[in-house]
């Protein structure tokens, strides 16, 4: 399937209706997975179908939880998503008991024509068991290393950790993300007082800014052959009444924003704004 169609409409992010085995201290979704009794994959499918009728060419993001925690269910989800969407998967890239990195790669590569990118979480500090980096050589689709920088950017130790991290993934596409819990409408687009932006600028070559959206922005850098994007996004996506991200929760219920910021989606909110 071709992937060169334009994105039209807000991103639909689906929280997979099954848990992960991680316990990352910064995870804001873990509490929602403590009780899975109301989770329903079929209702999630119905929600995906409804959103596809409204926005047949938007981005669909699978997150969690851990999408790769149940590879069978993940394949069912990928099979269900209609053609015409860019599909992204957020994962820590676990390799289950009795599996190899080749097993995982073989399953995901079956969807190489459907997957636009897999964002693989790696951090300056190890929070989860990481599979060997060699897995990235096995994939037949785009991957991106995703790192939320929680450490103090003014600390010299953070600088050393970041350089070591960038060297580890030299040649890969990398996305460094600001700690969204500190971002507001007043500072999300600010770089003058952004210590992490300054640190990245010191150790990488600045290239250009990404186009600003209502609730997020980004800046592109380069270092030793790696494209490095510094991404800043608010912890909420609905600004001035305009829905930026649509959330399908594990129950199949559809919300207009993230976590405690979100309310059940009012379809009428989607027709009052001209999405591009």
Language-model regions, residue ranges each:
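Core AdoMet radical
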Residues: 11, 29-42, 54-70, 84-100, ...
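Regulatory, intrinsically disordered low-complexity regions in eukaryotic nuclear proteins
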Residues: 31, 242-243
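Canonical Radical SAM [4Fe-4S] cluster-binding loop centered on the CxxxCxxC motif
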Residues: 1-44
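Distinct, well-ordered alpha-helical segments
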Residues: 72-77, 97-110, 129-134, 155-164
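Radical SAM enzyme [4Fe-4S]-AdoMet core and its adjacent flexible, acidic
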Residues: 36, 123-242, 250, 255, ...
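Hydrophobic positions in alpha-helices of CheY-like receiver
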Residues: 51, 77-81, 134-140
């Amino acid at each position: 399937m071709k992937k060169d169609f334009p994105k039209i409409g807000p991103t639909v992010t689906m929280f997979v209706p099954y848990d992960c085995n991680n316990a990352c201290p910064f995870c804001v979704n873990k509490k929602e997975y403590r009780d899975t009794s109301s989770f329903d994959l079929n209702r999630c499918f119905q929600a995906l179908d409804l959103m596809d009728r409204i926005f047949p060419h938007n981005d669909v993001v699978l997150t969690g939880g851990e999408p790769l925690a149940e590879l069978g269910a993940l394949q069912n989800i990928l099979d269900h998503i209609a053609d015409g969407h860019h599909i992204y998967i957020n994962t820590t890239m676990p390799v289950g008991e009795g599996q190899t990195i080749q097993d995982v790669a073989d399953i995901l590569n079956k969807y190489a024509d459907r997957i636009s990118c897999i964002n693989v979480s790696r951090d300056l500090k190890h929070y989860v068991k990481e599979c060997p980096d060699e897995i990235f050589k096995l994939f037949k689709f785009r991957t991106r290393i995703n790192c939320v920088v929680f450490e103090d950017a003014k600390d010299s130790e953070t600088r050393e950790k970041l350089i070591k991290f960038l060297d580890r993934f030299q040649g890969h596409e990398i996305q460094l993300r600001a700690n969204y819990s500190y971002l507001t409408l007043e500072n999300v687009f600010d770089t003058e007082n952004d210590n992490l932006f300054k640190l990245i600028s010191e150790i990488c070559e600045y290239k250009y800014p990404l186009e600003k959206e209502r609730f997020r922005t980004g800046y592109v850098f380069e270092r030793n052959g790696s494209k490095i994007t510094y991404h800043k996004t608010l912890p909420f996506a609905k600004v001035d009444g305009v829905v930026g991200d649509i959330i399908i929760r594990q129950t199949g219920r559809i919300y207009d924003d993230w976590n405690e910021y979100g309310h059940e989606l009012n379809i009428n909110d989607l027709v009052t704004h001209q999405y591009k």
